[in-house]
């Protein structure tokens, strides 16, 4: 299937266009130079043909959620959001030159680095959960690397708030890192499904492939979904990965959500225990504990306050389902 050409970059006062960074289903990302303060920035611009009230609300939700969360050291920083003269909404973000999605398939990442990344990204996810937000698309290509080598979680475009969802809520998802109950449309997303995605992501960074991907085999969507729903988690295949870590990852990807770690925080503690077992420096937990940081989630239409449950209501309402292929 041929990829579409990027849209025309908008004329943004105070910014100079440099080049295209990437294209997605609903938006393009461009590299601009901001004139004051002078710095490189990534600008995410919605496609004109998809802009309607529902999509505009979804984009506004992403901007608000990322602004609320981006003070976290492992969440991508958002600088501003606005609407271009041609009517397209845009988001100005910190520019990161690389993603883990580019690295993990090309080179074997050191075990210590993967454990540290896992703790940091899970800390970001735990912080989001405490503010009532699910990311719902945790995967290697959504982990960027800052100029200082720090991993940051990006793309809250299909994020949602805890408390009020229906299993029928259509969400964008990436099959290789999605929990079986999400693929089966039993839930739109839960804390437990985020734990699955965290485990699948850490596994991918270690193995150089997603957990149920078979090198040289049938990795089409149907085959992959079937293995995710029924097959056991295979070993990473790395001799330097201890049994304790294999067990942590297998537990995080248990078929039954109740058999997984109960939270991103519990997943963090398990990774830190492996660091201790290997006599590695312990990656610090980065979870905000103060009352302000634990305030209720952003609520655009006052329908999505935090509830007692762990299911979600999409901030965008109903958006069409799109399933990414096995490679991303």
Question: Language-model segments: which ranges?
Answer:
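Protein kinase glycine-rich loop
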Residues: 18-24, 29
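AlphaC helix of the eukaryotic protein kinase fold
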Residues: 45-69
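Conserved short submotifs of the Hanks-type protein kinase catalytic core
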Residues: 85-99, 103
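Activation segment signature within eukaryotic-like protein kinase domains
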Residues: 117-118
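A short, aromatic-enriched beta-strand patch in the conserved N-lobe beta-sheet
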Residues: 80-82
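Conserved HRD-motif arginine in the catalytic loop of eukaryotic-like protein kinases
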Residues: 260
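Protein kinase catalytic-loop region centered on the HRD/HxD motif
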Residues: 121-133
């Amino acid at each position: 299937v041929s990829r579409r050409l990027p849209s025309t970059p908008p004329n943004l006062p105070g910014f100079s266009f440099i080049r295209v960074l990437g294209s997605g289903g609903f938006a393009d990302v461009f590299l601009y130079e901001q004139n004051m303060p002078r710095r490189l920035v990534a600008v995410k611009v919605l496609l004109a043909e998809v802009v309607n009230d529902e999509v505009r609300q979804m984009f506004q939700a992403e901007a608000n959620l990322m602004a609320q969360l981006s003070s976290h050291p492992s969440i991508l920083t958002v600088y501003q959001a606005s609407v271009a003269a041609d009517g397209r909404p845009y988001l100005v973000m910190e520019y990161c030159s690389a993603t883990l999605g580019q690295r993990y398939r090309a080179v074997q990442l050191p075990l210590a680095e993967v454990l540290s990344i896992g703790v940091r990204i899970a800390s970001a996810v735990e912080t989001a959960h405490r503010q009532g937000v699910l990311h719902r698309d945790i995967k290697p290509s959504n982990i960027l690397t800052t100029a200082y080598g720090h991993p940051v979680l990006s793309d809250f475009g299909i994020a949602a708030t805890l408390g009020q969802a229906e299993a029928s809520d259509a969400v964008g998802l990436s099959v290789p890192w999605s929990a079986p109950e999400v693929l089966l449309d039993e839930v739109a997303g839960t804390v437990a499904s985020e734990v699955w995605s965290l485990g699948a992501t850490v596994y991918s960074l270690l193995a150089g492939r997603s957990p149920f991907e078979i090198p040289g085999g049938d990795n089409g969507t149907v085959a992959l979904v079937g293995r995710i729903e029924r097959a056991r988690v295979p070993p990473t295949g790395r001799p330097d990965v201890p049994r304790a870590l294999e067990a942590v990852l297998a537990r995080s990807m248990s078929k039954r959500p109740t058999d997984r770690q109960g939270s991103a925080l519990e997943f963090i503690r398990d990774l830190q225990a492996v660091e201790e077992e290997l006599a590695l420096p312990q990656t610090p937990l980065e979870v905000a504990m103060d009352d302000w940081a634990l305030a209720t989630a952003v609520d655009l239409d006052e329908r999505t306050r935090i509830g007692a449950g762990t299911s979600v209501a999409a901030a965008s309402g109903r958006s069409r389902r799109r399933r990414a292929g096995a490679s991303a």
